[in-house]
Design a protein with these regions (language model features):
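Internal helix-loop-helix
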Residues: 58-130, 170-177
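Intrinsic disorder at enzyme termini
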Residues: 1-22
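A short core secondary-structure module
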Residues: 159, 163-207
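Mature N-terminal segment immediately following signal peptide/propeptide cleavage
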Residues: 17-27, 32, 38
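C-terminal helix-coil-helix/basic helical segment that borders enzyme active sites and/or dimer interfaces
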Residues: 36-47
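A short, Trp-centered hydrophobic/proline-enriched beta-strand micro-motif
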Residues: 129-137
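A structural signal for short hydrophobic beta-strand segments in well-ordered beta-sheet cores
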Residues: 151-154
Length: 210
């Protein structure tokens, strides 16, 4: 069984209401059934089942806060639903929580900067659990120094040719879509763009860190 969370239903009512409490209880049931029984098995294997993404998508976990037109649930959803989600998943397994929610550091960039065509292409399959998205920022030469990013992207007709390396990418070995921070302009943060790279793109490779 999962121990009680730090914030219980009926308390801290300044921020939490019945909607948050109901979500917490439903999510706790999901975690107890789909995560807790398998944690030791996944720890030994060094990874958790990809099937969990699909189950989380069907449950509605991955679409929390994303527009309904992309298959998400945004009406009545606020930041505290997200806090509840992080708490309850972490109660089951912190590593699973970090990987399962890697979409929340990648899809927001597509939501904010992408075209409608890109949003329709990438967001629905990720929040449905059919595809996995991640964010690539950290580089071997400078960590997460965004202003100092060296990975370059040069336009070539209708495409960009990207040269560089990223590391420490959450869900990096199993993702289908990579939102990569690249330098397309001058020095500093103003010269950085976010480009979606799909797994299987010619010249793209993944190497596990061991």
């Amino acid at each position: 069984m999962i121990p009680p969370a730090g914030i219980e239903p009926g308390k801290n009512d300044l921020f939490y209401n019945e909607s948050h409490d109901a979500w917490r209880q439903e999510l706790r049931k999901f975690v107890s059934k789909e995560i807790v029984p398998f944690v030791e098995e996944w720890e030994e294997a060094g990874e958790f089942s990809r099937e969990l993404y699909k189950k989380a998508g069907e449950f509605g976990l991955l679409g929390m806060g994303y527009p309904e037109k992309y298959g998400g649930t945004s009406e009545g959803i606020d930041i505290f639903h997200g806090i509840v989600t992080s708490e309850e998943l972490a109660q089951g397994c912190g590593g699973v929580a970090a990987s399962l929610l890697s979409l929340n550091i990648s899809l927001p960039l597509i939501m904010a900067l992408g075209t409608e065509e890109q949003k329709q292409k990438y967001i629905p399959p990720v929040i449905a659990g059919d595809k996995i998205a991640c964010l690539g920022v950290t580089e071997p030469s400078g960590g997460s120094d965004v202003a100092g990013i060296k990975t370059k992207a040069v336009r070539d007709g209708n495409h960009f040719v990207i040269n560089g390396s990223k590391m420490f990418i959450t869900s990096g070995m199993r993702a289908d879509y990579y939102v990569i921070a690249c330098r397309t302009g001058g020095p500093g943060t103003s010269g950085i763009s976010a480009i979606v790279v799909e797994k299987g793109t010619p010249g793209f490779s993944q190497t596990p860190l061991k």
